[in-house]
Each structure stands twice: as C-alpha cells, then as structure tokens.
C-alpha cells in the first residue's frame, strides 16, 4: 500500500509539473518578451515549477502594464532588455498602484497588499537575475519598498470549543454521514 501511495504522489506531482511547464511554455511563446526565456531557464533549478508558473502569470501582468503605460506602441513580445533597463523604480511603484484596480484579459481585477507583494517579488527576481548576469546595469526593482501586509490575527479555540472538538473526534457524535465514513476508518 505504501509503495502505491508513493507512486500516486509521484504521478500527481509529475503530472502537475508537466502541465505547469506546458503553461509556462505557452506564456513564453504568446505573452512574455523573448528575454524571459533565458530568465525562466536560469531559475529552473532554483525554483519549483509552481513558483515559476506564478512568476510567469505575474510577469505577464507587469509587461502588459508596461505596454499600456510606458511603451504604448509595443506589445509585450516586442519588449527588449533595453526597454527593461529603462524601467525606473517610479515605473514599478506606478505598477503597484495600478494593481489596485486594473483591466487584464477583459476582466477588471484588484490586488490586496499580499498579492502586490508577490507580484513585486516576481518583478524583483527577474530584475535581479538580469542584473547579476550583467544584462542590465541597474536593478531599479530593488529600490522599491514592499507593500505593507497586515499581520493576521491568530484564531484560537476557547476551552469549551477544545473540549467539544475532542469529544466529537473521540465519539463521532454530531458528524455528517460523509464525515462518519472517515471517522470509522
């Protein structure tokens, strides 16, 4: 049984990674500038497939923003490393502001502080990669402050709730039919 479980997990992750890599390839072909191919190749051994996919989605939004606001006569696929190097920290701050309410793929979207922070992380990682390689001379993304995220309050059970939870877990009373099936295992 354990061997079967391990094989199933491997198949799940392998299948998921294959699908994610296909999505990344599609984004590289259809929505991202050509220099992004080098970037994603360069970070492949350093990041998980899921991270790269999220970065690809976030960079699509970033390059769409650049083409709308800074390079209106260009499409994302036409951008060059010279265009990237010309992006200022002010441009990136405008991007973060833009994320408060923007149109992408025909939808109106918004981002909260954690989402803005993640998108900034994707942009910073890309700038850092090209800066470290010597392809750009200035890493302006490093100059941009990270959006402040509110700390979430820790939710705790009171003594009665803990007691009730343990009682239900031990006895199974009050569970749905579906939950009872798991409880009986």
Name the predicted role of every residue range.
Residues 4-185:
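Conserved catalytic core of the tyrosine transesterase superfamily
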